A protein has these predicted regions:
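Structural recognition of the beta-strand scaffold that forms the well-ordered cores
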Residues: 43-48, 77-83, 92-96, 103, ...
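Active-site histidine-acidic residue metal-binding/catalytic motifs
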Residues: 1-63, 74, 88, 96-102
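Mature extracellular/periplasmic domains of secretome proteins
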Residues: 57-76, 96, 120, 145-150
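Active-site-adjacent mobile loop/cap segments within catalytic or ligand-binding domains
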Residues: 81, 88, 133-192
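Substrate-binding clefts and substrate-entry loops adjacent to catalytic sites
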Residues: 101-109, 164-169
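Loop/turn elements at helix/coil->beta-strand transitions in domains of secreted/extracellular proteins
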Residues: 37-45, 70-79, 128-132, 152-156, ...
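Extracytoplasmic/secreted envelope proteins and their assembly/folding machinery
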Residues: 27-34, 58-61, 114-122, 175, ...
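Active-site-adjacent substrate-binding region
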Residues: 110-140
């Protein structure tokens, strides 16, 4: 998804994997992370709670605001985008924010904060699950992603394992550990 042109265009190469598999994996990981975070005392908002939902990007970003009011000041501390990768690899990484972002409400430290959030989560994933580190833990050159161009708070864009490789077994069997790692990484970010 490219967002820096102000309009936002999305393209997903269907040939890179089974689009019926990834949403379910991501939701399991998100629900596990939510349970862990709530156990730590955090208030968590999910953009979807079932596989039947596919909210627009505007709807997803609205969860950063009180009562989903895009005219209000954001009240979320961070936004975590949980994905699985595809295309012939193994391991976990975060997509680095590396652009010139101008959306309303962002702090001057948006890029650094977003990357630190992604790094905190990924460090936990590779140390607390069977997933390895992909690409040194960070995917550069994709800072144009619409999330980074529209999100008003620091955004961690995670690519957790490859659902079209042997990582799928880990993603299926270790969603609890992955959720705990995501929650632990968010907590690390919040306290540093």
């Amino acid at each position: 998804c490219h967002g820096s042109d102000g309009k936002g265009t999305c393209w997903y190469p269907i040939g890179n994997g089974n689009r019926d598999t990834e949403p379910g994996i991501n939701l399991k990981n998100a629900l596990a992370a939510k349970a862990e975070l709530e156990g730590m005392g955090y208030n968590v908002r999910l953009t979807r709670t079932t596989n039947d939902e596919n909210p627009s990007f505007k709807q997803r970003v609205s969860y950063c605001y009180p009562n989903n009011d895009l005219n209000a000041e954001p009240d979320a501390s961070c936004y975590v985008c949980i994905h699985s990768n595809a295309g012939g690899g193994r391991g976990s990484a975060y997509i680095a924010a590396d652009g010139s972002y101008t959306q309303k409400w962002i702090r001057t430290s948006f890029e650094d904060d977003s990357n630190f959030l992604g790094e905190c989560i990924n460090n936990r994933i590779i140390s607390e699950t069977s997933l390895s580190e992909y690409a040194g833990g960070v995917i550069n050159g994709q800072g144009y992603m619409i999330l980074f161009n529209k999100c008003p708070v620091p955004a961690g864009y995670m690519e957790i394992g490859f659902f079209d490789s042997s990582d799928l077994g880990i993603l299926d069997s270790e969603s609890g550990a992955i959720g705990r790692a995501i929650a632990g990484g968010i907590n690390d970010y919040m306290w540093n």
